[in-house]
């Protein structure tokens, strides 16, 4: 008999009366009146093993095993006694009567119980090998595998070719910082780890591969959040001779396919499409969570002439905004709740949080409860009530500041209230999945510090055809052929139609204040390639880590990556990054400059 004939979790009634050989880890050992029970675990689940004292040598071995010992057992599959069936296990109707038990490897006492749900992330990541034995982590990584497999199946059926692109490439410092790799052979020169395969996949389109994809690692040296890692995985795709709508349709179908085949979820037959400007106006975000049934109300124009400077000053400022968020039944919120929300929005730069409770709308200002009502004239109050559609029992929150502060703070408040216990109890948030496309992004954003425009996505995104003329006259008016797929408030994919004409690409570089010499030094290979009959092309990249995180209901993408980094970009398991030998540095022609120590 081979070392293993079945997986533990797959031993069911179909094997009754048969002798099986199983391998796995001891989840738990119990001694009941001289009979030893072992819960044996492998990647497929648990099976109960019964060790009878009649088999002396085997029983003596069973007395010595402990949690996480790696063992092999041979035994007979039989029904569990009446009243001992475990409906929670696939193998719960049977047990294995042990005939032979071999300890393949003993284990020291684990630093934690695998069924402890209150472990700190530091403990889990330090002992990641043990953490990965936990059923939830096994589930998450197998789900990740299934998502990748289904993506490959779909793309293969659509004629896409899996092509690898370089991991050691040229540094083009636009946007996030590059991870740099020093070259030993070329002293004083550096490779960069790719932030994406963007330029190489465009070159593959010029090279007539027509449809490309790869599931690949990307690297960005940036500050980390719950949904960011220094190295992350993209489902990266590019295609020739398709327009923006066709590209969106193609990859919308892919996401529908993946959700149906992996977690049996039917996403909308057609994803709604929302312009960037509408998303910002209604939700203050370019990745709105449509499950939350709260929206902004625009009040900037109605607050220009009020005596309340908190509102009128931003209302009259060039980059100012005044917006309201009506919360149905929010009159129930206590002053303590409101104070908590006020402190919350300060995180996003807001100076405070104005509010009005609507007690009796029919009484006008006399039916309103708020410290700010006395500062507003009747016309502004009427505009607030009419535009928000407020009813008795509602509360209206206000944000007034620079547009970015208003969008960030009120947008965060919208999500916080919607997903709160109050929001759930009052029907302010829906369950399920709410996908959409956000389109028509600005092509450029103005950087006040550098006094120049920067690319909102990347500098290879095509402007809308009707906006080509603005590249040289008014770049801020340009909209891009860019699109993001958003799901439940997460951007899970983003892409664009690319620039395929050298003269247009050069105009974009000029709009970004990248001169001809600099453009040639950084991107000459792309500009040259575009001159050889480059086809119209575009693509998209999906964040595999984010998609699996959402499907698994995980708190962080670190829960769907086998060996992730912390928020300080450290690997607690291997203790990376770490110092290297001085000899290695000399070979790379590198001398370290130690950071200055703070003065005492």
Curated annotation (Swiss-Prot):
Pfam families named in the record: GAD (PF02938), tRNA-synt_2 (PF00152), tRNA_anti-codon (PF01336)
Annotated region described as Aspartate, given as residue ranges: 198-201
Main location: cytoplasm
Name this protein carries in UniProt: Aspartate--tRNA(Asp/Asn) ligase
UniProt record similarity statement: Belongs to the class-II aminoacyl-tRNA synthetase family. Type 1 subfamily.
Any GO BP annotation: aspartyl-tRNA aminoacylation
Reactions this protein catalyses: tRNA(Asx) + L-aspartate + ATP = L-aspartyl-tRNA(Asx) + AMP + diphosphate
Chain positions recorded as L-aspartate binding sites: 174, 220, 457, 498
GO molecular function: aspartate-tRNA ligase activity; aspartate-tRNA(Asn) ligase activity; ATP binding; nucleic acid binding
Gene that specifies this protein: aspS
Site description Important for tRNA non-discrimination, residues in chain: 32, 83
SUPFAM superfamilies hit by this protein: Class II aaRS and biotin synthetases, GAD domain-like, Nucleic acid-binding proteins
Subcellular location: Cytoplasm
Purpose: Aspartyl-tRNA synthetase with relaxed tRNA specificity since it is able to aspartylate not only its cognate tRNA(Asp) but also tRNA(Asn). Reaction proceeds in two steps: L-aspartate is first activated by ATP to form Asp-AMP and then transferred to the acceptor end of tRNA(Asp/Asn).
Organism from which the protein derives: Burkholderia vietnamiensis (strain G4 / LMG 22486) (Burkholderia cepacia (strain R1808))
UniProt-listed Enzyme Commission number(s): 6.1.1.23
Entry's Gene Ontology cellular component terms: cytoplasm
């Amino acid at each position: 008999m081979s070392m293993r004939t079945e997986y533990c979790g797959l031993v069911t009634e179909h094997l009754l009366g048969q002798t099986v050989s199983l391998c796995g880890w001891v989840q738990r050992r119990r001694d009941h009146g001289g009979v030893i029970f072992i819960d044996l675990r492998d990647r497929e689940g648990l099976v109960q093993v019964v060790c009878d004292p009649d088999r002396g040598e085997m029983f003596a071995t069973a007395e010595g095993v402990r949690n996480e010992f790696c063992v092999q057992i041979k035994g007979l599959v039989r029904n569990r006694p009446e009243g001992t069936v475990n409906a929670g296990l696939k193998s719960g109707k049977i047990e294995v009567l042990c005939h032979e038990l071999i300890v393949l490897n003993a284990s020291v006492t684990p630093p934690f119980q695998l069924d402890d749900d209150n472990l700190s992330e530091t403990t889990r990541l330090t002992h990641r090998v043990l953490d990965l034995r936990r059923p939830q982590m096994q589930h998450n990584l197998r789900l990740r595998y299934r998502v990748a497999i289904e993506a490959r199946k779909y793309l293969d059926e659509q004629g896409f070719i899996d092509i690898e692109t370089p991991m050691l490439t040229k540094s083009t410092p636009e946007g996030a910082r590059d991870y740099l790799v020093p070259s030993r052979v070329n002293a004083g020169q550096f490779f960069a780890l790719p932030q994406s395969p963007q330029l190489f996949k465009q070159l593959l389109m010029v090279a007539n591969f027509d449809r490309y994809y790869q599931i690949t690692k990307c690297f960005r040296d940036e500050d980390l959040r719950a949904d960011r890692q220094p190295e992350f995985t993209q489902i990266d795709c590019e295609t020739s001779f398709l327009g923006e709508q066709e590209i969106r349709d193609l990859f919308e179908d892919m996401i529908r396919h993946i959700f149906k085949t992996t977690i049996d979820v039917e996403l909308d037959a057609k994803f709604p499409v929302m312009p960037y400007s509408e998303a910002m106006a209604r939700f203050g975000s370019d990745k709105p969570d449509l499950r939350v049934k709260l929206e902004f109300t625009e009040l900037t124009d109605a607050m220009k002439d009020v005596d309340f400077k908190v509102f009128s000053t931003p209302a009259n400022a060039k980059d100012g905004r005044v917006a309201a968020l009506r919360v149905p039944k929010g009159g129930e919120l206590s002053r303590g709740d409101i104070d908590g929300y006020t402190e919350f929005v300060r995180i996003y730069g807001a100076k405070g949080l104005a509010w009005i409770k609507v007690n009796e709308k029919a009484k006008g200002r006399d039916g309103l409860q708020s410290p700010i009502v006395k500062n507003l004239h009747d016309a502004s109050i009427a505009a607030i009530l009419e535009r928000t559609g407020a009813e008795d029992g509602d509360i209206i929150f206000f944000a007034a500041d620079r547009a970015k502060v208003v969008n960030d703070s009120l947008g965060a408040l919208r999500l916080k209230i919607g997903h709160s216990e109050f929001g759930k109890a009052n029907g302010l948030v829906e369950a399920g999945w709410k996908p959409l496309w956000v389109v028509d992004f600005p092509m450029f954003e103005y950087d006040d510090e550098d006094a120049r425009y920067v690319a909102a996505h990347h500098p290879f995104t095509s402007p809308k055809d009707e906006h080509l003329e603005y590249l040289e006259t008014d770049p801020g008016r340009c909209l891009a052929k860019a699109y993001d797929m958003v799901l439940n408030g997460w951007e899970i994919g983003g892409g664009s139609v690319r620039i395929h004409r050298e003269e247009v690409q050069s105009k974009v570089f000029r709009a970004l204040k990248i001169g001809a010499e600099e453009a040639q030094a950084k991107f000459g290979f792309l500009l040259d390639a575009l001159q050889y009959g480059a086809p119209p092309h575009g693509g998209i990249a999906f964040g595999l880590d984010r998609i699996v995180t959402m499907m698994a209901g995980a708190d962080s993408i670190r829960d769907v990556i086998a060996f992730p980094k912390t928020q300080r970009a450290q690997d607690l398991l291997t203790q990376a990054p770490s110092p290297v030998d001085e000899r290695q540095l000399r070979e790379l022609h590198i001398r370290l400059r130690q950071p200055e120590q703070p003065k005492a």
